[in-house]
């Protein structure tokens, strides 16, 4: 089995991945040549057993398969050995395996497990606590080890209840079990889901290419889904509008940049990140237009600009309501039709998305949850039954986490209403996406040339 996981994997979004202003690149995920701490032994000071995982340097939960390790690395090693998986590194076997990036490359992580002394022969169903047991053992309160947040967030936590070989969430403490029945605070798992989604957002927004990219005008979509830089370079996402008014070509370039952002997000959010590239592309085609619309709308509100009727773009340009998008030539009628259609899209975007986001005062936590709910849609043609099942579980975990967060923040009655209004934003984004698709249809009818990537991905007639 070949490791098809993206370099911008889910684990790269864990806590302590860097300061908010840091720029992340592929190089930051690779092994440094010198100076990195790596546990060289299993004993701490004065012969005491180390509390640091020998594989990823996270907080260890005990001795597993011959070495001191965390639950995450223990479970990863056990699943790999039991399934007989054979991973292949795509980055010259130089991937850095630490707390923040341990899931960047499964091949290098498994090799690190072997290097520090994990023993495949130690995995026995009759002795492995998470496998079949001849004599099942019960936990006592005194035997429960501490587990750090970084060790638990390898996946969306509620996904683990779907996997029979899950370890992290099954062994981690949950505040839900310790809370009184009437306690409205979100559970530890719910908080973990929202924290992870926020970290994913921060990572993907900060991604920039620090090398020259091979951008193509006609990139093959099957390849671009795993190499988004074929579509556009990862330039700084800056929605401040300081560069002035955008024209039609500028809008096209910005749409390409937001498509790259969406691809990076898809390649980061599990379980989507673990799917086959063909299934990732199917998901991308189904969500990319409303996803970009919701992303752009939220950023236009978040900057708190005085022009409430303008749409702000990631290049630093803006689209005021009164500004013409096209430069007219001799074919006056064609451009009048196109301008009217473009104005319809702009008006729908402003009224259905931007004004609603501003009215609801949507928070970043709510927005990252909404985007994940949109992306984790299993009702997409072309997905396997197994993939659909994974998406269902993941989506429900995000929905539950969001609702628990709303109850804790607003109380039950208001939370129910707000939850419904937030979900309606997804429907509104889809309506705006159809008006954008209508613009592309008119462009085709009047022989106005459309960017290949935009027509391929944003024209809903192709879905």
From Swiss-Prot:
ZnF NR C4-type span: 53-73, 89-113
Pfam families assigned: Hormone_recep, zf-C4
GO cellular component: RNA polymerase II transcription regulator complex
Cellular compartment(s): Nucleus
Compositionally skewed regions (Basic and acidic residues) per UniProt: 121-131
Database matches in InterPro entries: HNF4-like_DBD, NHR-like_dom_sf, Nucl_hrmn_rcpt_lig-bd, Orphan_Nuclear_Rcpt, Znf_hrmn_rcpt, Znf_NHR/GATA
Location of the DNA-binding region in this protein: 50-125
UniProt KW keywords: DNA-binding, Metal-binding, Nucleus, Receptor, Transcription, Transcription regulation, Zinc, Zinc-finger
SUPFAM superfamilies (UniProt xref): Glucocorticoid receptor-like (DNA-binding domain), Nuclear receptor ligand-binding domain
Superkingdom of origin: Eukaryota
Molecular function (Gene Ontology), one example: DNA-binding transcription factor activity
Ranges where the NR LBD domain occurs: 199-462
Biological process (GO), any one: tissue development
Region (Disordered): 121-143
PANTHER family in UniProt: NUCLEAR HORMONE RECEPTOR E75, NUCLEAR HORMONE RECEPTOR FAMILY MEMBER NHR-31-RELATED
Biological role stated in the UniProt entry: Orphan nuclear receptor.
Family: Belongs to the nuclear hormone receptor family.
Protein name per UniProt: Nuclear hormone receptor family member nhr-3
Organism: Caenorhabditis elegans
